[in-house]
Amino acid sequence: MKKAVVLGLILVAVYAAGAWALWPFNKTTENIQPSVKGNRHSQSFYAVKAEMLDKVYYDHRKTLYCNADFTAHKKIIKPDGFKIPNLRQIDFKVYDISPEDLQRKAERMEWEHIVPAQNFGKTFTEWSKGHKNCVSGKGKAFKGRSCAEQESEDFRYMYTDMYNLYPSIGAVNYLRANFSFTQFDARQKNTFGRCSMKISRNKAEPPNQVKGMIARTYLYMQKTYPRYSIGEPAYSVLKAWNKKYPVSKWECARAFRIEKVQGNANMLVKKPCLERGWYQDNWR
């Protein structure tokens, strides 16, 4: 009897100490824990863009929204049917750009923050109010992105998080601006010809094939950086997209490569990729 009691106490103690984690559960999901660690790899946006090109997108040079090819020198090869819109056709937004400059932007690839920098930047006082060191050579105080990037290490790490960066046609990136994503009525027309990216009334809807990737990027940023919150109604839309549009082999390889470089995982991507056996460098 005493031996049984002692043995029972030992088992309880072992369980409480966490030895249960050694039990051989399903190998595709064992030891997977939500990641709360964010980017601590680089604070240089310039350096990170080069790494994205050379270490992540080296064999998948396609833009996110319109699936356009781009070269190692970031020159866009426009897909068939891609068109630059008449800016007057996009409701409620006045763009400070000439048609000629917009056309030039359509010819180059840019790295887009899927969660716009302004959305999380405004949570930093350096962005919203400035800093005593944010003074120009002419003695004029400034705030916003320039001040946050100059004075806040935490902002720089969020700004250069590789999971939040995707290649985009420059004109699409410019017109999407800092708009949140939504689900338009089915009657809403494409903004860029055959590319099914839609922008209207200061909102945007991406093509179906990338809605899952976008949702998992937003949800990762909110989970990893608690100062950022998505808010409604966007949060409900993104949660629905995450459920409806599962990971692809490319999304899995992209996350695998970023983890190798940046050091932390996006578990919203990694877990389903592991379950499918797709969390690896090869995506073809």
Language-model features: where?
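Nuclease and nuclease-like effector domains acting on nucleic acids or nucleotide cofactors
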Residues: M1-E107, T125-C134, D185-R201, W278-R284
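Domain-level detector of nuclease and nuclease-like folds
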Residues: E100-R284
